[in-house]
Every structure is written in structure tokens, then in C-alpha cells.
Amino acid sequence: MDDKRRLILDQALALVDERGLAAMSMRAVAERVGLTSMALYPYVGGKDALLDGLVDLLHLELGTSVGDDLAEFGWRERLRALGRAVRSLAHAHPSAFPLLLNRSAAGASASWLTAALRGILHDAGVPASAIPRLARMICAFLLGYTTGEVTGGLPRVPPDPESAPDPASEAADAAAREAEFDADLADLITLVAHAAPHPADDRT
């Protein structure tokens, strides 16, 4: 990615992190990088293209966070690590993250997550004909669950209306959410294993 384009996208993402997606405009981003709005166009195009660029940047960040270190691990651990990386990305960029669900085909790196999932499913021994469907299903869960989590769209246990906010209760809720997500990942791993006629060993 061009250095100037990367700088602009980094600043656009920082703006969204600080002030929300509604605050992002060409003018606001231009001010952060010391340019005019028109000067952004050669690097990121218009606002729609800028949003696509944010999707690209988020996928790049996800790929970097997972890295190549998992290549030596089995498919189960790789799927678990990928799921947790998606969730960490959602919590790091809660305002921008829903773009991955709403603009899933955008950006030059937008196929990274699907490609990573397909590689894991292949290594698990899933038949080639079943890989696209399973990859879409797992991708939909990872992006849908985490988007709901950071936007407040997931159902949660209602607090006692007569109780004051309890930080300990909030921490417990966060821990329960994490445990639920890990349990869901375990269920997905079991589903993948059942989809493979001869499931690969963890070290495969």
C-alpha cells in the first residue's frame, strides 16, 4: 500500500475510533493529514472509496495480528486463533468494524478472511465442494457475532432497574461474553470436524 494512502487511511480510522463513523468526512480526514479535501482524491478517491479503504485496512490489521506464526499449528488452533483475532479487532475498532459486515466485498484485501478460512477448512480435511459454504457460514458468525457485541445488538441479561451500575457486574458480563464466544468457537470446530470424512490431526 502506498505510504501516503496508508497515512490517510490510518488517520481516517483513528478519526472513526475517536468520534464514530458519522464524523468521518473527506474534510475531517484532510484536516488530520494537513491536506485539502480535493488533495485526498488521488490517494483514496471519494468517501465511498475511503470507506472501502478502511475495510482494506482492517483486513490488513487482522492479517498482521494473526501473522504467519500459526502455520506450524493444527487447524483447530488456527481456527480458534483466527476467531479470537476477529473479536479483538472488533473491540479495538468498534465504530469501524461493522464495515466488514456491511461492505464485505470492498478493499483489495477484503478476501483475506475468507481465504484464511478456506485454507483452514482444507487442512481440516473438509471436502472441496463443502468448503465455500462452511467458510461463508463461519465468516458470517465471526463478523455477525462480534458486530452485535460491539454495537450492543446482542441480547444480554437485563440489569436490575433499581440497582446502580456495578463495575464488577460489567466485568463479569464481559467475561461471560468471552466465555460464550469461546464456546461457540468450540462448537464450530466440532462442526468442521464432523464435515470432514477423515478429520485431520491437530498437527496436520
List where the protein language model places each region.
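Short hydrophobic clusters on alpha-helical segments that form packing/core surfaces
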Residues: 8-16, 54, 58, 86, ...
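Hydrophobic alpha-helical connector segments
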Residues: 64-103, 109, 128, 138
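C-terminal peripheral helix-coil segments that are non-catalytic and often amphipathic
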Residues: 123, 151-204
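Helix-turn-helix
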Residues: 7, 11, 15-49, 53
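A contiguous pocket-lining binding segment that forms or flanks enzyme active sites
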Residues: 113-146
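Alpha-helical DNA-contacting segments of helix-turn-helix folds
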Residues: 16, 51-58, 104, 109, ...
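Actinobacteria-biased recognition of intrinsically disordered, low-complexity terminal regions
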Residues: 1-7, 13, 68, 197-204
